[in-house]
């Protein structure tokens, strides 16, 4: 838990703390407020997102870690990380403001430093708030026979209820 404070401290050192001031501004302005690169357009998975997302691999050996950035209003479809043993995903918010929601539960707001552990088999989605850029580290939890099942889009009737 104390290690996560390093992300918040690094952000304070390398930015002027104005992440909220670029909430719905340009990608270039937002990129200056986070400590990981935004990366490239997430074309490979675009069909599973509403809006534009970007990915930047942070760790490629061992346990994969990717920085995923969502433009304001962008979210991924409902999906499930599957595994026969272990598996799942951990999200660590590193910039902006976003949401995570499990099927049948209320959405959880995510801000820099917040972390969510998603066990294998849990239907969920995550993405940016309607008025803010959002970045999180996506950490694949080691497991056996890991896969992701992509499901239906998060409809406007669900997304429009976010505050």
Please annotate each region the language model reported.
Residues 4-10, 14-66, 77, 147-163:
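A short, N-terminal "cap"/entry segment at the start of jelly-roll beta-barrel domains
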Residues 66-84:
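Conserved short histidine dyad/triad with adjacent acidic residue
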Residues 69-70, 82, 94-97, 104, ...:
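A mature extracytoplasmic/lumenal domain signature
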Residues 75-77, 99, 106, 116, ...:
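Histidine-centered metal-chelating micro-motifs
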Residues 85-112:
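A short beta-strand-loop-beta hairpin characteristic of the jelly-roll/cupin
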Residues 120-147:
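Ligand-binding loop in jelly-roll beta-barrel domains
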């Amino acid at each position: 838990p104390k290690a996560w404070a390093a992300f918040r401290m690094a952000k304070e050192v390398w930015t002027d703390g104005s992440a909220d001031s670029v909430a719905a501004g340009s990608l270039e302005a937002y990129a200056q407020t986070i400590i990981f690169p935004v990366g490239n357009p997430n074309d490979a998975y675009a069909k599973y997102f509403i809006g534009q997302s970007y990915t930047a691999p942070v760790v490629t050996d061992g346990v994969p870690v990717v920085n995923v950035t969502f433009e304001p209003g962008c979210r991924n479809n409902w999906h499930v990380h599957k595994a026969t043993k272990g598996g799942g995903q951990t999200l660590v918010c590193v910039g902006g403001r976003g949401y995570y929601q499990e099927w049948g539960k209320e959405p959880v707001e995510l801000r820099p430093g917040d972390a969510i552990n998603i066990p294998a088999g849990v239907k969920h989605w995550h993405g940016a708030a309607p008025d803010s850029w959002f970045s999180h580290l996506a950490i694949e939890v080691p497991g056996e026979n890991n896969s992701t099942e992509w499901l239906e889009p998060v409809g406007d009737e669900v997304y429009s209820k976010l505050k």
